Amino acid sequence: MNNHRLMQRDLAVLWHPCTQMHDHEQIPIVPIAKASGVWLTDFDGKRYVDAISSWWVNIWGHANPHINNAIKEQLDTLEHLILAGFSHEPIVTLSEKLLALAPKGLARCFYADNGSAAIEVALKMSMHFWHNQGETAKTRFVSLSGSYHGETLGALSVTDIPLFSQTYASLLTQQYRVPSPDWTQAPDGVTPEAFARQQFLAMETLLAEKHPEICAVIVEPLIQGAAGMKMYHPVYLQLLRAACDKYGVHLIADEIAVGFARTGTFFACEQAHICPDFLCLSKALTAGYL
């Protein structure tokens, strides 16, 4: 196999994600033969640094020996098992370890397939909870301007990046948006904390007026990644947690990108000293292995 041959085979059978395939008529695909640590190697022996961590996923390096050996050992014992009516030791051990690391107040783990599915589960669980409480008018969600929460229809409904959602607008449910506390939008001389407090007024007003129909607020804590790494002050999360408690609304923390120490604390929510009602994880949870 060589680079050119694999590129030909690829273009004959694959559509790549987040890609205009016509671009690859002029811009070659990078074919990779193997990887180790941060290095990717093509079929001609040229090496590349995986600086995007394969889309923010690979936190332990490619072909990590410890992980490789653990997976090989597990494959000889049990490769997969339905969790409806069954259990196994690895899933219980993982759940125990995750809960020990998570903000205090989170008590159960639920597993889905990927990040978008994690968001879908959180949205559904929130609505289901309120309906079980007799609060059947609660069917709406709130997200921030510039938010990104995934590519499936429910996740796209709480996403505010037209590049991803505009084409499918007629399929999406209508949700509430409030201005982001992204500090790059702050006037000169305004501190990140002051701007976050100012921007929170719109959220407070919406929750005060519409909380009878709102299930949850969903946010990317501290950093809105797909919007361009837009950052905001932790005080916004503190104010949001208090307001969600005040108005009877869930708080969903989408830490799919920022979880697992990417912001300096193990979870970004820890910098605000809050516990969300739902904590959505993916990416670094499996480091791309599973």
Task: Enumerate the language-model features and the residues they cover.
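Conserved N-terminal phosphate-binding loop of PLP-dependent enzymes in the Aspartate aminotransferase
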Residues: 1-290
